[in-house]
Amino acid sequence: MLRLLTSVFLISSAGIASAQGKNDGWLDLLGDNLSAWKEPYGDWQQIAGVELDAKLPRKFLAKDGKGVWYNGPKGNARNLFSRQNFGDVEIHFEFNIPKGSNSGIKFHGHYEIQILDSFGKKNLTGDDCGGIYPRAELKPRYMHIDKGIAPKLNACKAPGDWQTLDVVFLAPRFDKEGKKIKNAMIAQAMLNGQVIHNKQELMTPTGDRWKNAEMREGPLMVQADHGPVAFRNMKVRAIK
């Protein structure tokens, strides 16, 4: 495991330069179409950019063109699930949210790193931007049963500013009988260039998925039904 972690950090340190230069195994998830994701897509739209609505700062004004994908004028589209499954994986993307908005990226569809307008907040929990989302119960009503894992610091930018998230995720390990012998891990996560998680074990999945069976591989999921969010330059690379 130590050798794997060392390799992961070497990959991570060079990863973004590679993503922006040579392909080096990186897969572009948001190109000219959404073919990397399972249908249906709902109200996802390709645009040139977004800006805050001066009259309604919880909404975006979209600019015609290409290069950015957002979840439509209502801020409520289908969650995206990747066609490809991943085990150990590295992801880089840029995101933009208006005031009060909420999204997230889930590894294996189970382990969520939160995307939220947490600009200026001092007392952080896993429900804040970059946090590892709290576990939750659905009944009798949706409620958190813990605080999740807070980011090490608040690196969240102001609503309307483009932000970057870089994550190295290591899948759980299982023996020949299928018994888990190693927890999943966020080997490293960086929000806007600042380390927010380092070698953070994930004892269970997050949110209401925490009781679900864990897997060697699973899809990436992008949450799109909790308010406006825009993405660009989303790239993923499997770690061998």
Enumerate the language-model features and the residues they cover.
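Carbohydrate-interacting regions of secretory-pathway proteins
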Residues: 19-240
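Sec-dependent N-terminal signal peptides
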Residues: 4-13
